[in-house]
Amino acid sequence: GHVLSHNSGALRLLGVEEPEGEVNVLVLNREEPFRQAVDEVLSGHRSQQMLRLNGRCCQLLANPVMQGEEQMGAVMVLLDVTEQEQREDLRREFTANVSHELKTPLTSISGIAEIMQSGMVKAEDVQGFASDIYQEAQRLIALVEDIIRLSQLDEGAVNMEREDVDLFQLSLEVTKRLESAAQKNDVTIKTMGRSVQVHGVRRVLDEMIYNLCDNAIKYNRRGGTVAVTVGPVEGGVEVSVEDNGIGIPAEDQNRVFERFYRVDKSHSKDISGTGLGLSIVKHGAALHDGQIRLESTPGKGTTVTLLLPQG
């Protein structure tokens, strides 16, 4: 079949120059899916194929053009569906990760309950088994709450009521709530700086600071410190959370804000958490037109800084 007409968008996706004169359609592309679509449509059948063209994911739709019973030609349409495919890949990955994260505590709960149901547990051990079930149930609740929160931030469904928030005071409240967790890990947590105002969603700002501090405690060392510093800077206000813990390798630093991403998976098994905390920080920063800066040296510690517009 020969090309009767085309547009520049199709040529751009195919990565070919403007053809001179009448050319065979297969000159444009000789990949098997393209050839199959041409064969099918010239035989009077509709065809739909997926193509990889110059790093882009494209959908090829081909339909015969009929006049009565006679086929007069065919129309082929190329659609760039790269972004849709990327979103679908992210959705599949997210679903797989959620399924795995849900299965782990559920398996533990089921196993413990089965042992208790069988009557194999001594009376003095029941309290310990019940405590294990409670801890796994709390882990499930935290995971579900984080998934819901992340979904709300994704869709902009968070209660968007904004107010003036003193970030220094908010940071003091957050570190106060985390003092017990810090003590259990032999970590000292402190807040420094002065009052600065932002106009934002208090609950989201609270969660952002909490998640950063919580991570700094969990991935710290015995006798370590977590320092939260709040203050004005050129262009807005900053909240930085600095620890002297295990640090993050350079190759992982661009990925730590991805959902469920764990830097050291073997070490992370011993650390509680949903794997969604930093992703919530990332989405919360975007909600407030803010920026995130991460600096880390393995073995020395990590500093995560939030830059937010001043209220």
List each language-model region with its residue ranges.
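Short acidic helix/loop segment immediately C-terminal to the autophosphorylated histidine
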Residues: Q117-E124
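Short conserved segments within the C-terminal catalytic ATPase subdomain
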Residues: A181-V196
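PAS-family sensory/regulatory modules and their coupling/dimerization elements
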Residues: P19-E83
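Short alpha-helical segment of the dimerization/phosphotransfer core of two-component systems
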Residues: Q135-L140
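Conserved glycine-rich
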Residues: D289-G290
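Short conserved segment of the HATPase_c
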Residues: I248-R262
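Conserved micro-motifs of the catalytic ATP-binding
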Residues: E155-M160, G193, Q197-R203
